[in-house]
């Protein structure tokens, strides 16, 4: 079955796996999902990214992070902002600060996919893909 929104699919798989305290989760690989996974790793939400398979069957294996002795997920919430039916674009000044800077907005810019902090530093705006905190 065709997936019409791979970003929402990725966020849902990560959210479900972290709620069930799984060590890893698999996500279909694409340039966009790789870029989002790299931003999540840079921001400390996932620990490792591995790739399995080749071609259209390739999958990213994401190692999820937990904190404390009760293994609380580092990802509390993931929300899709810009959707296929309603795209949300922001300029540099309009980029959101998630939870006053504690969370991350993932932005697709002309310079690639990056966090809101990096986009402000680069002075670029773009499509607000999701919020993670």
From Swiss-Prot:
Region (Disordered) residue spans: 1-30
Annotated source species: Synechococcus sp. (strain CC9902)
Family: Belongs to the universal ribosomal protein uS8 family.
GO terms for MF: rRNA binding; structural constituent of ribosome
Domain of life: Bacteria
Name used for this protein in its record: Small ribosomal subunit protein uS8
Matches recorded under SUPFAM superfamilies: Ribosomal protein S8
The organism's taxonomic lineage, starting at the top: Bacteria, Bacillati, Cyanobacteriota, Cyanophyceae, Synechococcales
Composition bias, Basic and acidic residues: 16-25
Gene name, Swiss-Prot/TrEMBL: rpsH
